[in-house]
């Protein structure tokens, strides 16, 4: 779907114990490792393959507040502020750009639906607005279809999935986190009704706290400690293009179709 994932080399050896063990080397796992390590917490991250080997390198890379459930927005607003400082935080360019996102309206019912969200945007002083005509056409050069209007948030943006999680993992390692690759966690251990560690394919790591960030595999691990984690599997088709000159710089979505320009000049569709 996208360019190759930036490599994070192996090298750390498995310790006998840590304050926190994180299961999963996707963007949630590596971000947790980074901020714990920066606070001086002893943290070990266990990844069964390589960093960003699954969904964290295959997603759209959208960094957005637009269209979110109002209950998510306080957290998402803070998260986007952090994306704005990501290069300073991790010391690398992960492709974050505030290129804006469009929710395209094909008819009046779409306009009505998306206009409802403008009330939420106003509560958080977002720069979201409904655009149409020339304002919309200018954001979609070369478009062969005329859309009725679009919900637009210029300050939302995108990052490169193949770069972001690996860069954060490297920063976490520099901050003191131990990153174990090709080290699958087989189960979570408990003693006296409390988490006591994890069993990996290389043995036991004792820890009083375990963060399960295993993506599609999280529910399987959570069952070990009696936690039911509902998950929904969704299958979709995505393609990428070679670099294209011109074309829209931002990202857009409508029913059945979406696109995002990548840092290499191509599009994920």
Task: Annotate each language-model stretch with its function.
Residues 24-26, 48:
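Glycine-rich Rossmann-fold phosphate-binding loop(s) that bind the pyrophosphate
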Residues 151-209:
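Helical element adjacent to the flavin cofactor pocket in flavoenzyme catalytic cores
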Residues 1-20, 38-39:
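Extreme N-terminal leader/targeting segments of oxidoreductases
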Residues 28, 51, 217:
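Conserved Rossmann-like nucleotide-cofactor binding loop
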Residues 37-57:
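Glycine-rich FAD pyrophosphate-binding loop
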Residues 61-139, 256-269:
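Dinucleotide-binding Rossmann-like beta1-alpha1 core, especially the glycine-rich loop
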Residues 31, 188-269:
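Flavin-dependent oxidoreductases
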